[in-house]
């Protein structure tokens, strides 16, 4: 199904009604710019159906926070392998921000490894991106990152598409 098809546009509009960021993440994942995405806010069956209608596989994963409270995450991808990797590593487990976890999540979410390593050492370190460029990313770019520079045109294209839907 082509990105400019009426069905895709309609699903994106409906996802956008829920949350712009959800629609944007979904299309970045559908178009292969992100191998896997995670939605940390509640998502009902209708939202899951919309993700599936645009060609994404979905899975809801239960995790815990430090207080022991259960939280539900929705993960989605075009590849069952990424969903299985995430589920095996994180289902039923507490959320943690260890360097090991951040590296693994960075891999799954398609973040440049150099940016992940820099973020672990120095979160939100100054980079050379204009604020409007950093805003369309889901990772914090490291200084002079060549991979981020290569990703940005695709991210901008999808961001503009979602804005126009």
What residues fall within each predicted segment?
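A conserved ligand/cofactor-binding region detector
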Residues: 1-93, 104, 111-117, 121-165
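An amphipathic, hydrophobic-aromatic interaction surface with interspersed Lys/Arg
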Residues: 99-106
């Amino acid at each position: 199904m082509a990105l400019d098809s009426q069905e895709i546009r309609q699903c994106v509009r409906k996802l956008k009604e829920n949350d712009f960021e959800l629609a944007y993440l979904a299309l970045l994942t559908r178009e292969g710019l992100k191998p896997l995405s995670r939605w940390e806010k509640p998502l009902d069956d209708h939202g899951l159906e919309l993700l599936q209608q645009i060609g994404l596989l979905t899975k809801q994963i239960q995790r815990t926070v430090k207080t022991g409270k259960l939280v539900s995450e929705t993960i989605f991808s075009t590849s069952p392998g990424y969903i299985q990797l995430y589920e095996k590593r994180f289902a039923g487990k507490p959320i943690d921000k260890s360097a090991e976890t951040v590296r693994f999540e960075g891999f799954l979410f398609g973040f440049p490894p150099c940016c992940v390593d820099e973020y672990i050492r120095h979160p939100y370190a100054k980079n050379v991106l204009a604020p409007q460029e950093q805003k369309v990313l889901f990772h914090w770019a490291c200084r002079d990152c060549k991979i981020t520079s290569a990703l940005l045109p695709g991210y901008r294209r999808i961001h503009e598409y979602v804005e126009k839907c």
